[in-house]
Amino acid sequence: MLASAPVRYTYNFALYVATPELVNSNLQQLVAAAADLCRKPWRHAVLPLDDAQRCDDCNLRLEVRQADGERYPAADLEIEIYRSGDDLNLTLAWYHDQQRPLLWQGSHPVWMEPESGLRCERPVDGAPLEALARRLRALLVPLD
């Protein structure tokens, strides 16, 4: 082979899809990065709420900090990731305000009243949560 001949590399990027095996090792970093992207300018830390660390069955708390590093607990979220049949579902709820609507994200977003479970309108500040739920679901559902 000549020194000037181009060398071609073939990468199988499918190996790097967020499969359960890959995500198990860094689920908290994945969730925090997605939250940082979808809920700017806030920064997020992720804490497990239970012992489960499987990407398809866990409860997490997102702790929010403002850009200056000051904690902002009013924006903290609880995220539940769970499998129902073959589908991956997420629920997102404000951690410190149990009266606010919660978001269920399966194949589409549904906002619900926490007391009754009845559908309701998306809150004014709900769009970033929908974006976060879509992004997380896309990252965690393996490609066919």
Residues covered by each model-derived region:
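Short, conserved beta-strand/beta-arch hydrophobic-aromatic motifs that form part
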Residues: 77-105
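Ampiphathic alpha-helical segments that act as solvent-exposed interaction surfaces
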Residues: 107-144
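Negatively charged, low-complexity tracts enriched in Asp/Glu with abundant Ser/Thr
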Residues: 2-78
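Generic "edge-of-domain/loop-turn" microfeature
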Residues: 67-71, 86, 99, 111
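Generic marker of "main functional regions" within proteins
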Residues: 40, 44-48, 91, 114, ...
